[in-house]
């Protein structure tokens, strides 16, 4: 680990709690590989302290911040500017200083898209099905719209929350592509899904043997479909295990986590960053913790 001096610049993550965050693992590995005189640390900021903390971190010369739960939405009014992507998602996960205050964006969209873009597929005429309607699903919907996916189906168990999700969008392209359907519709929509995304927490600890879908539903996916789970531990999740048994292409949340972090680090440092180093550091940490 490089030594910290009086000239070392600070980056960090704010959340509450924040001790579980894997961002310091990835970012410090990259900073060390780049021989950059930066350090990335975790700042546990209680909700009632957010306003004073944002001002204080800025006044202290902190260069950039990752934002995690519970601050991703409530921090937005404290910023001088947010990107259109963050506005669409309704949340920020990355902040940087602009001389007047903090600006914000949402790199979850870029993180979600990166492994799909690697596949170099044409998404026009494709159908994507998203399980769940939380904050992660919002980033996925924005990403799929940027990808050019013309049919985006969000499936959930609460009709009220589905209606709220559908009515929360103002972008005409998103409104045109988006449908919301009850969970019971899955058996009808899964056979036409080119991409099936789990944005729910089902399958995470403390219930790693659970899956959001019965295996019988996974078996209804077309043989060319892609299964994408935003969960990154366990690896693979039960949902992705079932998809792998079908011989489907699978993507897990670890790559999204790496890519959203790399996108943030590029903003802060204004240069290319070693994504492979970040990926290796994260996967090594996950293997040790398994």
UniProtKB/Swiss-Prot annotation:
Q: Name one Pfam family in it.
A: Shikimate_dh_N
Q: Does the keyword Oxidoreductase apply?
A: yes
Q: Which domain of life is it from?
A: Bacteria
Q: Which GO terms describe its cellular component?
A: cytosol
Q: A single GO BP annotation from the record?
A: chorismate biosynthetic process
| Record HAMAP family | Shikimate_DH_AroE (MF_00222)
User: What protein does this entry describe?
Assistant: Shikimate dehydrogenase (NADP(+))
